[in-house]
């Protein structure tokens, strides 16, 4: 797969995620961007800084009480959306992470993650902030922080989604 994507050299990504491996809340993004690829950690660029602000508002922290991972584990060329084949190649890694972490809630950041984990026809613009139970896990999709940087008009909706997440955490009596 790396050869197909012009990635003949070893991956720069050193980590498949970051955070508390015993977290009850798992955030899943699409894949690493340029900064993430260089630093080997998800959400470290401007989108990551925005995500950290939303987390802080509701009392969450990537260092303490959540885990962050991605659908794909290496950066697609030209920062394009990961192709289905790339997603399928990496999804077992995410499933293994989910089995190890055992989250109660998975927050899908953006369309790619939501369509891969919640429903193929998930529409972030219509279904963001909704909780959907699959097995023993509650899923919620919301806007990807990078999309918010491109379209700040969705920031209030995203804040509301995060506040709904905070309320769900309290309802489920999840210790944070």
Question: Locations of the language-model features?
Answer:
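A polyanion-binding, active-site-adjacent surface
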Residues: 1-176
């Amino acid at each position: 797969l790396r050869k197909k994507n012009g990635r003949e050299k070893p991956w720069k990504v050193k980590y498949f995620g970051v955070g508390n491996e015993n977290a009850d809340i798992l955030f899943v993004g699409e894949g690493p961007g340029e900064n993430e690829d260089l630093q080997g950690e998800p959400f470290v660029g401007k989108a990551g800084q925005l995500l950290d602000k939303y987390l802080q508002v509701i009392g969450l922290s990537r260092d303490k009480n959540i885990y962050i991972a991605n659908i794909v584990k290496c950066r697609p060329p030209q920062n394009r959306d990961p192709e289905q084949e790339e997603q399928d190649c990496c999804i077992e890694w995410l499933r293994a992470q989910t089995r190890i972490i055992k989250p109660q809630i998975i927050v899908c950041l953006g369309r790619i993650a939501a369509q891969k984990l919640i429903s193929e026809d998930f529409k972030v613009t219509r279904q963001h902030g909704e909780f959907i139970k699959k097995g023993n896990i509650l899923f919620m999709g919301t806007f990807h922080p990078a999309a918010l940087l491109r379209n700040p008009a969705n920031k209030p909706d995203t804040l509301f989604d995060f506040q709904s997440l905070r309320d769900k955490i309290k309802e489920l009596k999840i210790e944070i």
